[in-house]
UniProtKB/Swiss-Prot annotation:
The gene is spoIIAB. Keywords: ATP-binding, Kinase, Nucleotide-binding, Serine/threonine-protein kinase, Sporulation, Transferase. It comes from the Bacteria. Binds to sigma F and blocks its ability to form an RNA polymerase holoenzyme (E-sigma F). Phosphorylates SpoIIAA on a serine residue. This phosphorylation may enable SpoIIAA to act as an anti-anti-sigma factor that counteracts SpoIIAB and thus releases sigma F from inhibition. Its EC number is 2.7.11.1. Pfam families: HATPase_c_2. GO terms for molecular function: ATP binding; protein serine kinase activity; protein serine/threonine kinase activity; sigma factor antagonist activity. This is Anti-sigma F factor. SMART domains: HATPase_c. The keyword Transmembrane does not apply. GO terms for biological process: asexual sporulation; negative regulation of sporulation resulting in formation of a cellular spore; sporulation resulting in formation of a cellular spore. The keyword Cell cycle does not apply.
Length: 146
């Protein structure tokens, strides 16, 4: 059965945790493992942070949009901004590549997303924005605790 959620918020760093928790609460209906839930929360944090810091250059007037569709045990997550866009997506997806070397932890966002999700697609157009499509299958059988 299909279920979906849509969320929009100002591109402010304090909204990153709101996005992460909201998506996690929605995905919880699939009864994911703690690892699966942590991975989804981490990916949301990375994608939203990229939109805020890189897409909008910390301009709080920008809007970040998130859509989550759950269907047949698969989470389809979309994070979209209408910011500056990415001129070279392939380069941006390289580990440790960053346009902001002065920031701690820079350059690992896409690498983290690729490690935690089953599929990551990035579409971007300069001066129009970026959309990140993420997909994760949630395991159907859970380990039993004795």
């Amino acid at each position: 059965m299909r279920n979906e959620m849509h969320l929009q918020f100002s591109a402010r760093s304090e909204n990153e945790s709101f996005a992460r928790v909201t998506v996690a609460a929605f995905v919880a209906q699939l009864d994911p493992t703690m690892d699966e839930l942590t991975e989804i929360k981490t990916v949301v944090s990375e994608a939203v942070t990229n939109a805020i810091i890189h897409g909008y250059n910390n301009d709080p007037n920008g809007i970040v949009s998130i859509s989550v569709i759950i269907e047949d045990g698969v989470v389809h997550l979309t994070v979209r901004d209408e910011g500056v866009g990415i001129p070279d997506i392939e380069e941006a997806r390289q580990p440790l590549f960053t346009t902001k070397p002065e920031l701690e932890r820079s350059g690992m966002g896409f690498t983290i997303m690729e490690n935690f999700m089953d599929e990551v697609i990035v579409e971007s157009e300069v001066n129009k924005g970026t959309t990140v499509y993420l997909k994760k299958h949630i395991a159907k059988s859970k380990a039993l605790c004795n």
